[in-house]
Amino acid sequence: LYPNFRSLSIVNQDVFTITIGNPALLFKNGKVVYKEENEKVFYDSMDFWNDKEGLVVGDSMDGCISILITRDGGESWKKLDCSIFNKRLPNEGFFAASDTNISIVGNRAWIASGGINSRIYYSEDIGKSWKIIETPIIQGESTKGIFSIDFYDNKNGFAIGGDYTKPLENISNK
């Protein structure tokens, strides 16, 4: 087994990495702390609110996006139940190439999706509840949507994207 690492986070003295593909493996300091086996499993990005609480986001499987949450410093991870995303859309995914589709400021988190449907998943309470925000960014095909998101504070942020097959086009991409 040769892991293909997608995301890296360092929290205090702990190093977290996650792989893409089947099986998905999440490591803490070289030890597997979460494993998921599924033909469609693909985790894209990881970030932490603090030294105890963090999240990992992955592409949709069976019509539900994949979000993992830890509340114990990464010793264990729990996949959020799909029912909390009551407005989920089919074929919604995340762009893994950038590892910048999560932004965390204080207790808040923004997760930018892309592809057929490109929206922002927003939590203001360390991932305990989520709102879904529609965006005007170009979308509708698997190559379009938000590629990266970042917030400076609770009210000021920026999302960019477009269509990665048409890098010279500058239409509805920010």
Predicted regions and their residues:
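Residue-level hotspots at or immediately adjacent to binding/recognition sites across diverse folds
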Residues: 1-174
